[in-house]
Amino acid sequence: MRTVKSYVGYAIKSRQILFGVSNIVGAYGKKMPTVVIYDANIGESSKDKLLTFTNKNGIESFSLCVEDIYPDKNCKAIGVIDKNLATAIINRIRSLQNE
């Protein structure tokens, strides 16, 4: 999980991240996230809205504890825009799930 946290930190520093369901769902064009990480405690309507958006646009989404990844911000969903960072995050989360 520490590696995922580091990748999210790089995305924050490079301004290649979206915070919150409304920002993620409202994204389009070059600002479209490649991967979305949402908290398990997210509200049902927000979760439905987020999953509908990710499924419609072919975006990978994972349910993790967002507070462990980014504790400084009270946020339930994170979208990573940078494709290379998103690919690294996807690969790391999948390897953690397979362990």
Show which residues each predicted segment covers.
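Positively charged, polar, low-complexity stretches
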Residues: 21-26, 45-71, 93-97
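Short glycine-/polar-rich loops that comprise or flank the Walker A/P-loop
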Residues: 32-33, 59, 73-74
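C-terminal structural segments of small proteins and small subunits
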Residues: 67-99
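Short secondary-structure boundary segments
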Residues: 40
